[in-house]
C-alpha cells in the first residue's frame, strides 16, 4: 500500500475523515510558510499539499493566484521549495504532496524532480494540467521513486474515464467538487453527491474531496 493511501486509510480507521490542507509555498513569506507547515503537521494534518507557485495557474481562483503572484515576486521557486524540504527532512509526520503545473516541473527537470522528491520525503504529485492521455511516462518516472501521481476527477468525468484512472492510480483520488477554479463557496454543489457516488463505484483507492470547500 502506498504511504499516502495508508495515511488516508489510517484516518478512516480512527473514525474520522483525513485532513488534507493546501498551502502555497512561501506564503505569506518563507519563514511563516514553514512555521505553518509545522503547525498543520502538529495539529493533525494527515497529508499536506504544497502548492508550487506558477504565473498562469489556470485551475486556481483569485486567492491562490494572488498568493502565487506574491511569492513569485519574492523569489520563490521550485528549487527553493526543494531546498526547504531538504532542510526540513524528517520533520513532518504528514504525507507530503507537491501540487502544481507542468511548466515549472519540466523546466526543473522531471526525472531530477522525481528523484529529489524521494530523497526529501515527498510522496505524491498533483498536476492539474497533465491529461490522462499524456501522463503515462511521467507516472512511470514518479513510480520508480515511490511518488504517486494523484488523479483528479470531477463532475464531468465519465465512469469509463474514472476506471482508466483506477487501473493506474496510487495514493488517493482527488475528487474536484465543482467545475471551475479553486476557492471558497458558500455551499457545496449538489452534484458533489452524484460525483462521489460514481467515484466510489469506480475506485478502490480512497477519495479526497477538494475545490470550493468552506468548512470540514
List each language-model region with its residue ranges:
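Alpha-helix-loop-beta-strand connector modules within alpha/beta enzyme cores
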Residues: 10, 61-97, 140-154, 190-207
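Hydrophobic faces of well-ordered beta-strands that scaffold small-molecule active sites
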Residues: 19-23, 48-50, 96-100, 125-127, ...
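Glycine-rich, proline-tolerant flexible connector loops at the mouths of alpha/beta enzymes
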Residues: 27-29, 43-77, 132, 176-185
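Catalytic cores of alpha/beta
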Residues: 30-40, 157-168, 203, 209, ...
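Active-site beta->alpha loop and helix N-cap motifs at the rims of alpha/beta catalytic domains
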Residues: 47, 52-54, 63-128
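Glycine/Thr-rich beta-alpha phosphate-binding loop at enzyme active sites
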Residues: 64, 74, 162-201
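Catalytic beta/alpha-barrel core
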Residues: 73-76, 121-134, 148-157, 163, ...
Amino acid at each position: 500500500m502506498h504511504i499516502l493511501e495508508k495515511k488516508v486509510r489510517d484516518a478512516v480507521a480512527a473514525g474520522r475523515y483525513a485532513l488534507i490542507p493546501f498551502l502555497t509555498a512561501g506564503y505569506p513569506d518563507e519563514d511563516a510558510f514553514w512555521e505553518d507547515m509545522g503547525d498543520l503537521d502538529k495539529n493533525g494534518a494527515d497529508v499536506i499539499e504544497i502548492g508550487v507557485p506558477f504565473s498562469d495557474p489556470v485551475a486556481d481562483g483569485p486567492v491562490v493566484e494572488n498568493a502565487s503572484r506574491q511569492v513569485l515576486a519574492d523569489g520563490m521557486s521550485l528549487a527553493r521549495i526543494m531546498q526547504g524540504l531538504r532542510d526540513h527532512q524528517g520533520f513532518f509526520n504528514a504525507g507530503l504532496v507537491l501540487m502544481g503545473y507542468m511548466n515549472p516541473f519540466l523546466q526543473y527537470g522531471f526525472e531530477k524532480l522525481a528523484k529529489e522528491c524521494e530523497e526529501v520525503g515527498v510522496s505524491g504529485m498533483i498536476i492539474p494540467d497533465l491529461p490522462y492521455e499524456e501522463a503515462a511516462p511521467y507516472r512511470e518516472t514518479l513510480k520508480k521513486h515511490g511518488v504517486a501521481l494523484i488523479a483528479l476527477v470531477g463532475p464531468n468525468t465519465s465512469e469509463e474515464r474514472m476506471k482508466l484512472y483506477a487501473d493506474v492510480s496510487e495514493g488517493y483520488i482527488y475528487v474536484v467538487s465543482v467545475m471551475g477554479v479553486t476557492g471558497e463557496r458558500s455551499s457545496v454543489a449538489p452534484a458533489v453527491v452524484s460525483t462521489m457516488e460514481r467515484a466510489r463505484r469506480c475506485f478502490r483507492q480512497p477519495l479526497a474531496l477538494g475545490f470550493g470547500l468552506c468548512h470540514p
